[in-house]
């Protein structure tokens, strides 16, 4: 499965959002302002908000967002 960190737009200028994909499944999301805040798994864990229920609509939206290049995909930090 894919283990990735997806980087996207934040809620306001200067902020970015992230999605954590583990084994091909969306497990959490969060927001950050500075790149160093997402450089380690430990730091990500402090910012992440767990996703409990991923509906088919969310999966579809994520696929569409990928097609539109709305996310930058990085390797998930260890």
Regions of interest found by a model, annotated:
Residues 1-78:
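Conserved catalytic/ligand-binding micro-motifs in nucleotide and anionic cofactor chemistry
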């Amino acid at each position: 499965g894919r283990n990735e960190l997806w980087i996207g737009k934040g809620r306001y200028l200067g902020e970015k959002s992230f999605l954590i994909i583990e084994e091909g499944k969306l497990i959490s999301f969060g927001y950050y302002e500075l790149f160093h805040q997402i450089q380690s798994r430990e730091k990500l864990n402090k910012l992440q908000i767990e996703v409990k229920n991923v509906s088919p609509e969310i999966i579809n939206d994520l696929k569409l967002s990928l097609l539109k290049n709305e996310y930058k995909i990085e390797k998930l930090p260890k």
